[in-house]
Every structure is written in structure tokens, then in C-alpha cells.
Regions:
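Short, conserved, GDST-rich strand-edge loop motifs in beta-rich repeat architectures
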Residues: 81-86, 128-145, 188-214
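Blade-level signature of beta-propeller repeat domains, shared across WD40, Kelch, NHL, RCC1
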Residues: 326-371
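Repeated scaffold domains used in trafficking and secretory/extracellular systems
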Residues: 2-11, 46-70, 110-121, 168-180, ...
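Residue position within the beta-strands of beta-propeller blades
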Residues: 17-18, 77-79, 125-128, 184-187, ...
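Residue-level signature of beta-propeller blades and closely related beta-rich strand-turn architectures
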Residues: 21, 82, 129-132, 189, ...
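A short beta-strand motif characteristic of beta-propeller blades
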Residues: 1, 35-38, 43-60, 101-107, ...
Length: 371
């Protein structure tokens, strides 16, 4: 699985990212070593530019990063557009594991922004969003036509499958999950009666309350074999819907809940958040649900794990030392936190350390303020 965060793609044993010049780097999780993803002798690692339109470095990438560059089954894959041919077309690029012999393997039409990617079995599964409508001459005829959906590419024959689109203001895909030839994905959008002007006015008054009152959060499934899209549920007045192992976890003013995508039933979770605020996203590993709550009066963040409706406290940290879990990949827990120099950083701890309440992260990368 790949997880996009800032310009970073997180894997089980490494992290890939593109630097400001579009050069691919790999960070080895075990050692923390950051290296340019290139094994060509004497390469200067020059990226794309006006004076270097065809760089020889296999680590050079161009265009919107989209969902980043992913190592999978001994190949390097990239979903994006490095040709500037058409802003509504993206490609799946396939290359050798060292970045050489790059070729376009599949064409994705009517897709402007790739927002996430997942590699499972023999599929590339991605989420996208569009904002503008173009005519045949590629002129903008409507700059406010938001829509979003998912695509699936079969790596055996590079056939492209497309789900039905969701529309309306700020339509977006927030999570994707794959299991047994079915893709589950969560969506967010404003109701059909909410206009862009209403959103602007609501944001200027109280953006968080306006979103809570007017956002619709959905869970869909896409059956690849039948090429069928089904809306399983759409919920209003909730916060931060997350797909964890295919089920939808979220909170509202009434507490924490999980929507079971198989039974299509919702049940409340025994999480006591009275007088507390969720800190960071919910995450799962096996049967455990990990969550953190900040306490308004104590300036502390408490970390828990939940199993069989029983919560276990793992640790307490001051808000200055607190962290958010970005991803749990096997025994590696990737976290974001602020280091002693005030920089936002990506680091890693082991799952065993998390369960024992030990937070001594290995720093992998720090982000500039503009990132």
C-alpha cells in the first residue's frame, strides 16, 4: 500500500518522495538513510527544466506529483502526466525497478488530479478529482464543475475501469480500500443545494460549523468484475470519516461510530470523549483501533488502543511533544510530529514501542513551512 502525505509516499520498509527539482529520493526506514533513487555512475541528477527537457537521470519526474511514485512487484510505477499534452489526461508509467525504460502503459482520460493510489493484487486503484470543464479546443467553458471518482487499472492487460462520479461542490474521495475484487471508497461533498457562494460566506463566518452542518460523507463500493458502483450509505453531521479495513469510522457530537460495510449496520464505539478533542486520525492494526484525545484543561494528549469494546491507555504526552499516526505498515508506525527545532517531521517507531507507550521516533524527513 502507498499512502500520500505532503510529497511523501509511505511503504512498509521505505519512504519515497520527490524533491523540489522533481528528483525521486528513497529513505530506508531501518537506517534512516536518504538517497537519490538513481544508480547511474557519475549522474548529476538534473531534473526537468527549460534547458533540460529530456533529463537522463532515471530519478527525474515531471508534472503534478499526483499520487507519487511506487515500487510494486519489481517495477516502478507513476501515475501522472509528464508530457504536458492534455491537462485532462493522466498516464500510468511503468519502468524497471531502477527507473530505466520508462513507458506509458495505460491512459486515463477526463482526469485532472490524481489524489491517491493503492496497489493490490494485480490492480492499480486510484482516486481523482476534477474541477473545470473544457471544450474540444481545450478552452475552459466552466471553472466550477467539481466531480470525483475512482479508477482501476488491471496490470495484466492495462484495461481501465471507471466508477460512477460523485458531483456537487468540493466533491472528493477521502479513502480507498480493496478486498476480493471490490473497491470500497469514502467520499465527501456538499449537498446539491449548497452553492460556491454559500460556502465562501459560511467559511468566513465559521468554516468548521458550516462544513459539519452541510457536508455529506458517503461510502461506496465498486465491483470490478461487474463494473458496478453502489452507494452503501451517505451520512451528514459527522467528522472525519475514515475507511479502516473497509469499514467506516467517524465521530459526531453524539460520539464515535463504525459503519460495517458488509452488514450495512452502524454501531457506537465505547470511546469516552466528553470534554476532549480527537488528536490526529483513527488508525487500525489487526483487531486494535488506535486513537488519541487531547484534554482541554490539562494540555495533554492521551493515546489509546481499543479492542473488543475495551480501551487501554498507552501513554500521555504534552501537546508540544504529541504526534499523529500517519500510517501503520506491518510493524512500522509512521508518525508526524514537531521536532526540537520546531520543524514538522515524518518519523517512525515500531508497533511494539507504540503498544508499550514509548515515543522515541527515528527522524526520516522534515518539511519546509510551504509544504
Amino acid at each position: 500500500m502507498a499512502l500520500e502525505m505532503y510529497d511523501v509516499i509511505i511503504h512498509r520498509h521505505n519512504v519515497l518522495y520527490l524533491d523540489d527539482s522533481g528528483i525521486l529520493h528513497l529513505i530506508d526506514t531501518a537506517s534512516g538513510k536518504d538517497m537519490v533513487y538513481c544508480d547511474k555512475p557519475n549522474c548529476t541528477h538534473e531534473g526537468f527544466s527549460g534547458s533540460n527537457e529530456k533529463p537522463s537521470c532515471p530519478a527525474a519526474f515531471y508534472g503534478l506529483e499526483g499520487a507519487g511514485t511506487v515500487l510494486y512487484n519489481d517495477h516502478l510505477y507513476y501515475v501522472g502526466n509528464m508530457s504536458d499534452e492534455d491537462m485532462t489526461v493522466q498516464y500510468l508509467y511503468v519502468m524497471d525497478s531502477n527507473g530505466e525504460n520508462r513507458k506509458k502503459a495505460a491512459k486515463l482520460e477526463n482526469i485532472q488530479n490524481v489524489t491517491a493510489v493503492l496497489y493490490r493484487d494485480n490492480y492499480v486503484i486510484g482516486a481523482y478529482s476534477n474541477r473545470i470543464e473544457l471544450n474540444d479546443e481545450e478552452q475552459i467553458v466552466n471553472d466550477d464543475k467539481p466531480e470525483a471518482g475512482i479508477f482501476v487499472i488491471d496490470l495484466d492487460n492495462y484495461k481501465v475501469y471507471m466508477s460512477d462520479k460523485i458531483t456537487s461542490e468540493q466533491a472528493n474521495i477521502t479513502d480507498i480500500y480493496y478486498e476480493d475484487e471490490v473497491v470500497y471508497y469514502s467520499t465527501v461533498r456538499f449537498g446539491d443545494d449548497v452553492t460556491e457562494l454559500m460556502i465562501e460566506e459560511g467559511a468566513s463566518d465559521d468554516a468548521e460549523s458550516f462544513a459539519y452542518d452541510n457536508m455529506l460523507n458517503g461510502i461506496y463500493q465498486y465491483d470490478i468484475a461487474d463494473e458496478k458502483t453502489t452507494c452503501l450509505t451517505e451520512i451528514d453531521h459527522i467528522n472525519d470519516l475514515r475507511l479502516l479495513d473497509g469499514d467506516g469510522y467517524y465521530s459526531s457530537k453524539d460520539g464515535y461510530f463504525v459503519f460495517d460495510t458488509e452488514s450495512r449496520q452502524t454501531r457506537q464505539l465505547p470511546i469516552d470523549a466528553d470534554g476532549k478533542t480527537q488528536y490526529g486520525p483513527l488508525k487500525k492494526s489487526g483487531d486494535f483501533l488506535y486513537y488519541a484525545l487531547s484534554e482541554e484543561k490539562s494540555d495533554e494528549v492521551t493515546y489509546y488502543r481499543l479492542k473488543d469494546d475495551k480501551s487501554e491507555e498507552l501513554m500521555k504526552l504534552s501537546t508540544e511533544k504529541a504526534f499523529s499516526i500517519a500510517s501503520i505498515c506491518g510493524q512500522s508506525v509512521y508518525v508526524t510530529y514537531t521536532n526540537d527545532n520546531g520543524k514538522l517531521c515524518l518519523g517512525v517507531i515500531s508497533l511494539d514501542e507504540l503498544n508499550k507507550g514509548v515515543f522515541e521516533p527515528k527522524e526520516l524527513r522534515c518539511f519546509d513551512d510551504e509544504e
